[in-house]
Amino acid sequence: VATSEQFNKTFIELVIVVD
């Protein structure tokens, strides 16, 4: 199970890639 921290980190990284 991914923790909120891991999820947030992945989400931020995805946003950076998209941007």
From Swiss-Prot:
GO CC, one annotated term: extracellular region
GO MF term set: metal ion binding; metallopeptidase activity; toxin activity
Cofactor: Zn(2+)
Keywords from the named record: Blood coagulation cascade activating toxin, Disulfide bond, Glycoprotein, Hemostasis impairing toxin, Hydrolase, Metal-binding, Metalloprotease, Protease, Secreted, Toxin, Zinc
Main location: secreted
The keyword Protease is assigned to this record: yes
Compartments where located: Secreted
Domain Peptidase M12B span(s) in chain numbering: 10-19
Expressing tissues: Expressed by the venom gland.
EC class (word): hydrolase
Cofactor binding remark: Binds 1 zinc ion per subunit.
Modifications the protein undergoes after translation, according to the UniProt entry: N-glycosylated.
Assigned EC number: 3.4.24.58
Reaction it catalyzes: Specifically activates several components of the blood clotting system, including coagulation factor X, coagulation factor IX and protein C by cleavage of Arg-|-Xaa bonds. Has no action on insulin B chain
Any GO BP: proteolysis
Quaternary assembly: Heterotrimer; disulfide-linked. The heterotrimer consists of 1 heavy chain and 2 light chains (lectins): LC1 and LC2.
Family: Belongs to the venom metalloproteinase (M12B) family. P-III subfamily. P-IIId sub-subfamily.
Function statement: Catalytic subunit of coagulation factor X-activating enzyme, a zinc-protease enzyme that acts in hemostasis. Activates coagulation factor X (F10) by cleaving the Arg-Ile bond at position 234 and is also able to activate coagulation factor IX (F9) and protein C (PROC) by specific cleavage of Arg-Ile and Arg-Val bonds.
Protein name, UniProt field: Coagulation factor X-activating enzyme heavy chain
Natural source organism: Daboia russelii (Russel's viper)
